[in-house]
Amino acid sequence: PPPNPEGTRQARRNRRRRWRERQRQIRSIGAWILSTYLGRSAEPVPLQLPPLERLTLDCEEDCGTSGTQGVGSPQVLVESPAVLEQGTKE
């Protein structure tokens, strides 16, 4: 969580500085884990989604029932590219 906004100006400044340093360290550790163990960069890969017109809900079950039954799962009518394989090195 972000630092507490209480205290003197100097105390707030020090807390913000320490918090930013912790966030920087967390990001660098995450990038190291991604590059070392998963073989990909920490930069986000753009996710390619199909157009909304090609999405449909599979409603073979009763759609009028309550709860999670009958909701169906979104299905893509055309083949989508293998997005997950883009970030791997072979």
From Swiss-Prot:
Pfam families: REV. A motif (Nuclear export signal and binding to XPO1) lies at residues 47-58. GO terms for molecular function: DNA-binding transcription factor activity; RNA binding. Residues 10-21 have a biased composition (Basic residues). Residues 1-22 are annotated as: Disordered. Phosphorylated by protein kinase CK2. Presence of, and maybe binding to the N-terminus of the regulatory beta subunit of CK2 is necessary for CK2-mediated Rev's phosphorylation. The modification Phosphoserine is found at residues 66, 73. It comes from the Viruses. A motif (Nuclear localization signal and RNA-binding (RRE)) lies at residues 8-24. GO terms for cellular component: host cell cytoplasm; host cell nucleolus. InterPro entries: REV_protein (IPR000625). The keyword RNA-binding applies. GO terms for biological process: mRNA transport. Keywords: AIDS, Host cytoplasm, Host nucleus, Host-virus interaction, Methylation, mRNA transport, Phosphoprotein, RNA-binding, Transport. The RNA-binding motif binds to the RRE, a 240 bp stem-and-loop structure present in incompletely spliced viral pre-mRNAs. This region also contains the NLS which mediates nuclear localization via KPNB1 binding and, when the N-terminal sequence is present, nucleolar targeting. These overlapping functions prevent Rev bound to RRE from undesirable return to the nucleus. When Rev binds the RRE, the NLS becomes masked while the NES remains accessible. The leucine-rich NES mediates binding to human XPO1. Isolates WMJ1, WMJ2, and WMJ3 were obtained from blood samples sequentially taken from a two-year old Haitian who was perinatally infected by her mother. HIV-1 lineages are divided in three main groups, M (for Major), O (for Outlier), and N (for New, or Non-M, Non-O). The vast majority of strains found worldwide belong to the group M. Group O seems to be endemic to and largely confined to Cameroon and neighboring countries in West Central Africa, where these viruses represent a small minority of HIV-1 strains. The group N is represented by a limited number of isolates from Cameroonian persons. The group M is further subdivided in 9 clades or subtypes (A to D, F to H, J and K). Escorts unspliced or incompletely spliced viral pre-mRNAs (late transcripts) out of the nucleus of infected cells. These pre-mRNAs carry a recognition sequence called Rev responsive element (RRE) located in the env gene, that is not present in fully spliced viral mRNAs (early transcripts). This function is essential since most viral proteins are translated from unspliced or partially spliced pre-mRNAs which cannot exit the nucleus by the pathway used by fully processed cellular mRNAs. Rev itself is translated from a fully spliced mRNA that readily exits the nucleus. Homomultimer; when bound to the RRE. Multimeric assembly is essential for activity and may involve XPO1. Binds to human KPNB1, XPO1, TNPO1, RANBP5 and IPO7. This is Protein Rev. It comes from Human immunodeficiency virus type 1 group M subtype B (isolate WMJ22) (HIV-1). The gene is rev.
